[in-house]
Amino acid sequence: MKTLLLTLVVVTIVCLDLGYTRICFNHQSSQPQTTKTCSPGESSCYHKQWSDFRGTIIERGCGCPTVKPGIKLSCCESEVCNN
């Protein structure tokens, strides 16, 4: 009985995949495509876009930040969804 219970606990932990982390793109507008493994607890990715004297700037990363007016923000919750 103890063996069955222990086996059930191990299977549950493996199936739940405790400690799962999100992977997001984190490159800037003109940079080569790169990804980042997000910190535990960060379950979303963001794509932030604005314009200034340099032209259109795009920033990507983990989380879903608060932005100022005039900045376009898209947040998503799947792997590398912020391209």
From Swiss-Prot:
This is Erabutoxin b. It is found in: Secreted. Gene3D superfamilies: CD59 (2.10.60.10). The lineage of its organism: Eukaryota, Metazoa, Chordata, Craniata, Vertebrata. Disulfide bonds join C24-C45, C38-C62, C64-C75, C76-C81. The record marks H27, S30, Y46, F53, G55 as: Moderately important residue for binding to acetylcholine receptor. The record marks S29, Q31, K48, R54 as: Key residue for binding to acetylcholine receptor. Binds with high affinity to muscular nicotinic acetylcholine receptors (nAChRs) (tested on Torpedo marmorata, Kd=0.07 nM), and with low affinity to neuronal alpha-7/CHRNA7 nAChRs (tested on chimeric alpha-7/CHRNA7, Kd=22 uM) and inhibit acetylcholine from binding to the receptor, thereby impairing neuromuscular transmission. Produces peripheral paralysis by blocking neuromuscular transmission at the postsynaptic site.
